[in-house]
């Protein structure tokens, strides 16, 4: 959650460490599953700069795939623009992929990303090829899941069965 006006010095420090670690690890891909923005409808110039730098730096390291989280867009007003699309479009980075809608994206001949978008549930699809490694990307709550600290999510938006046809989720 990049806030509009707070913690930008801290974000820069943490992001700098993240970029350094990623460069050392040399990932094939970077996947971010939502909530880059803290507020979806009131965006500051400071947020735009921080988000732009964040996405550009990730995409400079490896192909970067991003889905929207509930804080990145307005679930109650689908006519409003999300907080990431204008930034991703302006960057025009060849390694930055904003996967806004539900659907399947092939990474190479072996992997498939399936976006289960909270903004596009009507268009969720199952993997098209069970021989690929199929990875579900989702940003939402799952009923009856339990954290490492023992807290249980009683009422989520979906249950764990949404991942049944995927190898990873």
Segments predicted by a language model, with ranges:
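Conserved acidic residues
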Residues: 28-30, 132-134, 167
């Amino acid at each position: 959650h990049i806030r509009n006006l707070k913690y930008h010095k801290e974000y820069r420090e943490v992001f700098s460490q993240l970029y350094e670690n990623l460069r050392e690890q040399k990932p094939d891909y970077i996947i971010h599953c939502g909530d880059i923005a803290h507020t979806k409808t009131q965006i500051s110039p400071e947020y735009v700069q921080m988000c732009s730098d964040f996405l550009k730096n990730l995409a400079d390291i490896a192909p970067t795939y991003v889905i929207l989280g509930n804080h990145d867009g307005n679930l109650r007003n689908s006519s409003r623009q999300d907080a990431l699309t204008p930034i991703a479009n302006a960057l025009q980075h060849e390694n930055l992929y904003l996967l806004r809608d539900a659907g399947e994206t092939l990474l190479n001949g072996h992997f498939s990303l399936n976006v289960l978008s909270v903004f596009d549930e009507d268009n969720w699809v199952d993997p098209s090829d069970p021989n690929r490694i199929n990875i579900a990307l989702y940003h939402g709550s799952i009923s009856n899941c339990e954290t490492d600290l023992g807290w249980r999510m009683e009422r989520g938006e979906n249950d764990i069965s949404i991942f049944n046809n995927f190898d990873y989720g």
